[in-house]
Amino acid sequence: MFETATLAAMARPTHFEIPVDDPDRAEKFYGDVFGWTFQRFEGAPEYYGLATTGDEGQGINGALFHRGSEGVLTLTMSVDSIEDAIAAVTGHGGAVVQGKTQIPGVGWFATCQDTEGNKFGLFTEDSSAS
């Protein structure tokens, strides 16, 4: 029978990113349509607005960022162990695009690619990441 890895069964979407051409227009659209609120992320090399889609425990948070050459939606999955998740990705035919990367005081992030060429993120919360 089909066997699903525990990691895949436990992972849940935790973050999304939407490419935009006009950040102010996009903030207005998503704010008006869905009630999302935004906070500009200081220190990012380009515009990066964090979106809050619901109260604590509801919805998932995401971001708007300047559209580059690849205007695609990015989904990030929350996992218990970034190392185990990366191993599972590569062990099942996927690839690592950007390895384990520190987000100081927040956690660890990696960008991967599935067997169909779709990019997605992995995130492990760890407030001691430094």
Q: Language-model features: where?
A:
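Short, charged/polar, Gly/Pro-enriched secondary-structure boundary elements
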Residues: E56-G62, N118-F120
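Core segments of cupin and vicinal oxygen chelate
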Residues: A8-A11, E17-G59
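Acetyl-CoA-dependent GNAT
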Residues: L64-H66, E125-D126
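Vicinal oxygen chelate
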Residues: F2-A9, T14, I18, Q39, ...
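Mid-chain, well-packed structural core segment of small domains
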Residues: G68-V96
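Structural motif
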Residues: P13, G59-G62, V72-T74, G107
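Short acidic/glycine-enriched loop/turn segments that link adjacent beta-strands
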Residues: A44-Y47, S69-G71, I103-W108
